[in-house]
């Protein structure tokens, strides 16, 4: 998983507004249980997308699903 974070962070270093990298990085954070970092990526997408974009919508849904599963335990 470390390589995933390394590569997505490098993609964002090269292009800080790359919506796909923010979405996938947020989803990767969810896979390791770091909801706060996933929400940071969602906030970044909120600033980048002038109108709701699919990357924002998809990450928001993934976070909601993650939180619903966590609260159901």
Model-derived regions: residue spans:
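Structural marker of alpha-solenoid helical repeat scaffolds
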Residues: 14, 47-51
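Canonical tetratricopeptide repeat
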Residues: 24, 58-62
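Register position in tetratricopeptide repeats
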Residues: 31, 48, 62-69
């Amino acid at each position: 998983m470390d390589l995933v974070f390394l590569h997505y962070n490098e993609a964002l270093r090269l292009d800080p507004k790359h919506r796909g990298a923010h979405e996938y990085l947020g989803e990767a954070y969810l896979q390791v249980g770091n909801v706060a970092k996933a929400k940071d990526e969602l906030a970044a997408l909120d600033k980048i997308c002038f109108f709701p974009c699919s990357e924002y919508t998809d990450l928001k849904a993934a976070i909601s699903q993650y939180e619903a599963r966590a609260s159901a335990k």
